[in-house]
Swiss-Prot record:
Gene3D superfamilies: 1.10.287.70, Helix hairpin bin, Jelly Rolls
Keyword Lipoprotein: no
Tissue expression: Highly expressed in pyramidal and granule layer of the hippocampus, in thalamus anterior nucleus, in the supraoptic nucleus in hypothalamus, in cerebellum, and in trapezoid nuclei and superior olivary complex in the auditory system. Detected in a subset of elongated cells in taste buds.
Chain's gene name: Hcn4
Residues bound to 3',5'-cyclic GMP: Y559, K562, F564, E566
Positions with a binding annotation for 3',5'-cyclic AMP: G659, E660, C662, R669, T670, V673, R710
Matching InterPro entries: cNMP-bd_CS (IPR018488), cNMP-bd_dom (IPR000595), cNMP-bd_dom_sf (IPR018490), Ion_trans_dom (IPR005821), Ion_trans_N (IPR013621), K/Na_HCN_channel (IPR051413), K_chnl_volt-dep_EAG/ELK/ERG (IPR003938), RmlC-like_jellyroll (IPR014710)
Biased composition (Acidic residues): 26-36
Gene source species: Rattus norvegicus (Rat)
Extracellular side: 288-293, 362-368, 442-464, 487-496
Identification of the protein by name: Potassium/sodium hyperpolarization-activated cyclic nucleotide-gated channel 4
Post-translational modification: S-palmitoylated.
Length: 1198
């Protein structure tokens, strides 16, 4: 009865007094076994079983027992739903509706049958049956069967009628009827009792609800909360809820070790323990009066908290270290705590010193009083040291916190361990310092102790503590003895103890610090260990040094100082997280690849998850032609070259891919791929490639289209791919949107290949190549004389030569680099042009144009080079050219119409002239043909403002004009026998005239006496290499010279193409580049003394210039007649510098770099008498005005 809840007890008290004398509680499980219900069992539900009371008459009792047996049997047959108990929130148990009505209705009809199935209680009385009926009718609204319908079978769904009150007196009835009458009476009484209990229930439930709210709130603090740590500990929120149910079912006041209450209590105790462990030693050692009120209050409060903690430890669950089980049973908790730390915690929690003082004050013995002063003080201090045993509790709490931090953050766990170790060392130093002073104090400061020797017995406690701590740390760190070495025996033993403790703590600190440092950068440590193994492997196999260096460079670029097991790390992650990490790692690759930018995001994710990272070094062959392809590669960073057997090369850079052709055709590699730089690639195996493309057929068609385009660019065909793409196009597989996407991918791929080639070609121009002057020694023995001339020495050792002379020929995809060049001295160039325009003698300028070498030109002619009509004068022929001579009539201007025809043989000239040009369909030799005269000899039209003097290059390729020459120009003829031309110009049998011809100015420059008009030339425009679109036509005007003749230059740059930036060279260090045909011809012509020389002309430098000026200008043609001393003249005033027969020109052995002016245009020098407008927009000068200092000119020896 004591275990029942109050509401149940009130219900039992409200029963009739003759009923309920003996009752006991039975579990629902036992009820089910006895009644044969077999239903669901709930341990929280209880049922009441009452002993039968003695019945008034045996017959009635027998009949009632039969009826009861029948009713119980019918109830058992109705299943578990009807016989199960009904439990409310306050713990009372009730039957389900209809169960008792069925018992009453079936009592009479099935008495005999129910008697056999009764539970053995044959002596149950009518009072017990009435109690059960009353229990079933306790709640209002429950069904009851009227007495008149007791024997009728129960109709489902029939409305229940309340039982009518029976009359007070009734005649005797049969047994069944007599059994029903007491039931009805009992029901009336129980209803009245139930009404009385319902009036009492609300007040009790309100009080119970108020107390239940506080209990629930406090109970929630004792249970584990749903937070980050509990979720990490138990795995899920459902597991946390199950743990909360465990705490509820364990009993009252069971505290979970991971509950919020225990967390804050442990934090409070931790701070209190630290304060105790610091303050108590200082108070015991340095303060003699310990009975002050603050000290007593502090100790009492501390002891009270520790005693409360001792009690709470008996109700706190214990975490088993072997597994994750948490003990919540109070009996197991008590036994486990008593066997472990109870004794230490109890001794450190009880105030032993105060108990001793209380006992001591009650003893009044005189002998005791006389000797108690010192003894009490000493013993009390020793007993107070028992509180220091709380250190064990501090260590346990810190260990728990370390576990918490270790489960959440690994780095925080390492830091917490280091902080704990440092704090523990400082605490031991603090204790050791107090002990160093406590021992002499307990000995009453003997004369040989360190306190007496240093005279600190009566000093302040701060000074005493400072020196004691210094002495203790000196011992513990093993660096000394403090102020002096120990003298007394007690000091010696204390010193040894300090050294042992200090050495142990120091070793622990070093070990923990090393472990922390290693754990902070484990990946770098792993890389260093791995590379040590690699070094030992290289030493064991005795690899050569260059191989070792390559291995070292590979490891540096591949792992970059950190090594991870990336496959295992990603394999342990979930698939969405793995895809997110891979997408982040490959974000640069996706951003730079047009294929991925235009593709389905699902395709990109599927592709990226199957990629494998690889690194290749410069010179590594990633793919070799003819091998079976098993991978394709995506370039994240780097440049590779696609090589074929035809030596046709293609560059691929960041964002491109290669190796997909054999994966698509299941064939062999069609080209080799070599890494030009360090390449960071992602590889895709053939199985993964086909697996991905099966899901995305549009991307397969994109790969096939790009592969066909690439094969076409390197000059190869693949019938399988071509057939597949053609079949897709004919079958209409491509819709408009897919076709647009594929075309965009192909266009981006072409652009990337073009950009990669340009970048690589520009980078290859940076190294210092072979000088131009030494190329003829290898290519043509006929040109060997050029190396011995002063011009060769001057050009080779000159530090300021333009970079265009030493640059290699541009590649097929390089394009017009002249457009992007920047002039080094633009203002100097603008100031030199008007000066040259007003000079009497022409000024020459070095050529800034890239020209092909003589060997390449010779190969083109041997291979059957057929020049267009406009270029026929460039190739001397024995049948088509008349004898060389000079034409005195000026050429006529030629109209230009642009064409798009390309000429492979003239591609180098086109690139030399600056990129994509447009030319005229009329022959270029119109102004160059012998005997061509201009009908407009008197009226020179103004030259085009945008004209560039790029044809100065062609001037040195022209054969000598016919023999008709003007009188004014014949004394200044410059000649070279055709037989002495370089092999690059020998296209056929050279013409050998009887007398050695003298090359004169070309016909387009020779109209001097007639005041010939300048002629604009438009070279061929379709001469650009593949990939270049023709640009607007460019015209090249020919300026009319004076009577003395207008002379071309040795090195002729286009005026609109500024010199590229060049790397300064040291004097005497020749830059190394391939040679140029132009330079070879000029140098040979300059080194052949074909004409008699009248006298030696010396090169005179008028004024020095800074080394920033580009190059010296050399006058190729002489100045005939008497000339005024205008700027640009080389000799004394009035002395012509013509090539007089019998005269030799002596060249200086050294040419100063300061005497070289910036390059000038081909037609930058005009005669003073020319009336035509200037060629440039620079301001004009008077012919006699000296705008620039006189420069030294190198006259030709021809």
């Amino acid at each position: 009865m004591d275990k029942l809840p109050p509401s149940m007890r009130k219900r039992l008290y409200s029963l009739p007094q003759q009923v309920g004398a003996k009752a006991w509680i039975m579990d629902e499980e036992e009820d089910g076994e006895e009644e044969g219900a077999g239903g669901l069992q709930d341990p929280s539900r209880r049922s009441i079983r009452l002993r039968p009371l003695p019945s008034p008459s045996p017959s009635v009792a027998a009949g009632c027992s039969e009826s009861r047996g029948a009713a119980l049997g019918a109830a058992d047959s109705e299943g578990p739903g009807r016989s199960a108990g009904k439990s409310s929130t306050n713990g009372d148990c009730r039957r389900f509706r209809g169960s008792l009505a069925s018992l009453g209705s079936r009592g009479g009809g099935s008495g005999g049958a129910g008697g056999g199935s009764s539970l053995g209680h044959l002596h149950d009385s009518a009072e017990e049956r009435r109690l059960i009926a009353a229990e079933g009718d306790a709640s209002p609204g429950e069904d009851r069967t009227p007495p008149g319908l007791a024997t009728e079978p129960e109709r489902p769904g029939a409305a229940a009628q309340p039982a009518a009150s029976p009359p007070p007196q009734q005649p005797p009835q049969p047994a069944s009827a007599s059994c029903e009458q007491p039931s009805a009476d009992t029901a009336i009484k129980v209803e009245g009792g139930a009404a009385a209990s319902d009036q009492i229930l609300p007040e009790a439930e309100v009080r119970l609800g108020q107390s239940g709210f506080m209990q629930r709130q406090f109970g929630a603090m004792l249970q584990p909360g749903v937070n980050k740590f509990s979720l990490r500990m138990f795995g899920s929120q459902k597991a946390v809820e199950r743990e909360q149910e465990r705490v509820k079912s364990a009993g009252f006041w069971i505290i979970h070790p991971y509950s919020d209450f225990r967390f804050y209590w442990d934090l409070t105790m931790l701070l209190l323990m630290v304060g105790n462990l610091i303050i108590i030693p200082v108070g015991i050692t340095f303060f003699k009066d310990e009975n002050t009120t603050p000290w007593i209050v502090f100790n009492v409060v501390s002891d009270t908290f520790f005693l409360i903690d001792l009690v709470l430890n008996f109700r706190t669950g214990i975490v088993v270290e072997d597994n994750t089980e948490i003990i919540l049973d109070p009996q197991r908790i008590k036994m486990k705590y008593l066997k472990s730390w109870f004794v230490v915690d109890f001794i450190s929690s009880i105030p032993v010193d105060y108990i001793f003082l209380i006992v001591e004050t009650r003893i009044d013995s005189e002998v005791y009083k006389t000797a108690r002063a010192l003894r009490i003080v000493r013993f009390t201090k020793i007993l107070s040291l028992l509180r220091l045993l709380r250190l064990s509790r501090l260590i346990r709490y810190i260990h728990q916190w370390e576990e918490i931090f270790h489960m959440t953050y690994d780095l925080a766990s390492a830091v917490v361990r280091i902080v704990n170790l440092i704090g523990m060392m400082l605490l031991l130093c603090h204790w050791d310092g107090c002990l160093q002073f406590l021992v002499p104090m307990l000995q009453d400061f003997p004369h040989d102790c360190w306190v007496s020797i240093n005279g600190m017995v009566n000093n302040s406690w701060g000074k005493q503590y400072s020196y004691a701590l210094f002495k203790a740390m000196s011992h513990m760190l093993c660096i000394g003895y403090g102020r002096q070495a120990p003298v007394g025996m007690s000091d010696v033993w204390l010193t040894m103890l300090s050294m042992i403790v200090g050495a142990t703590c120091y070793a622990m600190f070093i070990g923990h610090a090393t472990a922390l440092i290693q754990s902070l950068d484990s990946s770098r440590r792993q890389y260093q260990e791995k590379y040590k193994q690699v070094e030992q492997y290289m030493s064991f196999h005795k690899l050569p040094p260059d191989t070792r260096q390559r291995i070292h460079d590979y490891y540096e670029h591949r792992y970059q100082g950190k090594m991870f097991d990336e496959e295992s790390i990603l394999g342990e992650l979930s698939e969405p997280l793995r895809e997110e990490i891979i997408n982040f790692n490959c974000r640069k690759l996706v951003a730079s690849m047009p294929l991925f930018a235009n593709a389905d995001p699902n395709f990109v994710t599927s592709m990226l998850t199957k990629l494998r990272f690889e690194v290749f070094q410069p010179g590594d062959y990633i793919i070799r032609e003819g091998t079976i392809g098993k991978k394709m590669y995506f370039i994240q960073h780097g440049v590779v070259s696609v090589l074929t057997k035809g030596n046709k090369e293609t560059k691929l850079a960041d964002g491109s891919y290669f190796g997909e052709i054999c994966l698509l055709t299941r064939g062999r590699r069609t080209a080799s791929v070599r890494a030009d730089t360090y390449c960071r690639l992602y590889s895709l195996s053939v199985d993964n490639f086909n697996e991905v493309l099966e899901e995305y057929p549009m991307m397969r068609r994109a790969f096939e289209t790009v592969a066909l385009d690439r094969l076409d660019r390197i000059g190869k065909k693949n019938s399988i791919l071509l057939h597949k793409v053609q079949h897709d196009l004919n079958s209409g597989v491509f819709n408009y949107q897919e076709n647009e996407i594929i075309q965009q991918i192909v266009r981006h791929d072409r652009e990337m290949a073009h950009c990669a080639h340009r970048v690589q070609a520009a980078a290859s121009a940076t190294p210092t190549p072979t000088p131009v002057i030494w190329t003829p020694l290898i290519q043509a023995p006929l040109q060997a004389a050029a190396a011995t001339t002063s011009v060769a020495i001057a050009l080779t050792h000159h530090p300021r030569l333009p970079a265009a002379i030493f640059r290699p020929p541009p590649g097929p995809g390089l394009g017009n680099l002249g457009a992007g060049q920047t002039p080094r001295h633009p203002r100097r160039l603008q100031s030199l042009i008007p000066s040259a325009l007003g000079s009497a003698s022409p000024a020459s300028s070095p050529s800034q144009v890239d020209t092909p070498s003589s060997s390449s030109f010779h190969i083109q002619q041997l291979a059957g080079f057929s020049a267009p009509p406009g270029l026929s004068p460039l190739l001397p022929s024995s049948s088509s050219s008349p004898p060389p001579g000079a034409c005195s009539s000026p050429p006529a201007p030629t109209p230009s119409t642009s064409t798009a025809a390309t000429t492979t043989g003239f591609g180098h000239f086109h690139k030399a002239l600056g990129g994509s040009l447009s030319s005229s369909d009329s022959p270029l030799l119109t102004p160059l043909q012998p005997g061509a005269r201009s009908p407009q000899a008197a009226q020179p039209p103004p030259p085009l403002p945008g004209a560039r003097g790029g044809l100065g290059l062609l001037e040195h390729f022209l054969p000598p004009p016919p023999s008709s020459r003007s009188p004014s120009s014949s004394p200044g003829q410059l000649g070279q026998p055709p037989g002495e031309l370089s092999p690059g110009l020998a296209a056929g049998p050279p013409s050998t005239p009887e007398t050695p011809p003298r090359p004169e100015r070309p016909s387009f420059m020779a109209g001097a006496s007639g005041g010939a008009s300048p002629v604009a030339f438009t070279p061929r425009g379709g001469l650009s290499p593949p990939g270049h679109s023709p640009g607007p036509p460019r015209t090249f005007p020919s300026a009319p010279p004076r009577a003395s003749g207008s002379h071309g230059s040795l090195l002729l740059p286009p005026a609109s193409s500024p010199p590229p930036p060049q790397v300064p060279q040291r004097r005497g260090t020749p830059p190394l580049t391939p040679g140029r045909l132009t330079q070879d011809l000029k140098l040979i012509s300059a080194s052949q003394p074909a004409l008699p020389q009248d006298g030696a002309q010396t090169l005179r430098r008028a004024s020095p210039h800074s080394s920033g000026e580009s190059m010296a200008a050399f006058s190729l043609y002489p100045r005939a007649g008497g000339g005024s001393g205008s700027s640009g003249g080389l000799g004394p005033p009035g002395r012509p510098y013509g090539a007089i027969p019998g005269q030799h020109v002596t060249l200086p052995r050294k040419t100063s770099s300061g005497s070289l002016p910036p390059p000038l245009s081909l037609f930058g020098a005009r005669a003073a008498s020319s009336g035509g407008p200037p060629l440039t927009a620079a301001p004009q000068r008077e012919p006699g005005a000296r705008s620039e200092p006189v420069r030294s000119k190198l006259p030709s020896n021809l």
